[in-house]
Amino acid sequence: MPNTRPLSPHLGIYRWRVNMLQSTLHRLTGLFLCLGTLLVTWGLIAAASSGAAWHLFAAFCGSWIGLVLLFLWTWSLLFHLCNGLQHLLRDMGVNFGPANRDRTHDPVYWSAGWAIVAISVVLTVLVWVLLLLQVGGGAA
């Protein structure tokens, strides 16, 4: 006999919202931070061992794939930090209570989520601009 029971809740009723994006990105950036820590560990081990190991590590980090991975790792770190601070504020009850219970339909409520994504991107670009200026000899 076929199962005729309804599926509940069905995925078709959900609308993609910024908090779903934040939750997914928070988990993915946490995973990427763990994987990126392997790259940092490789660098520490290479620095503590021979000069050849360090030159291999530096060559990898200077390649286009190394730079992309380091850029994404930086963004992951800063997004995870910003989103974690937002979680902390929500855990402390900031903007929760009877006066704010219907804010889920408020555009300002949702724009705060997009602000976290934007702030993390701006901070990442700022870090890399400062880093490239420092490496390039533009800063004293």
Report each predicted region and the residues it spans.
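Membrane-embedded alpha-helical bundles that constitute the cytochrome b-like, heme-associated redox core
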Residues: 1-140
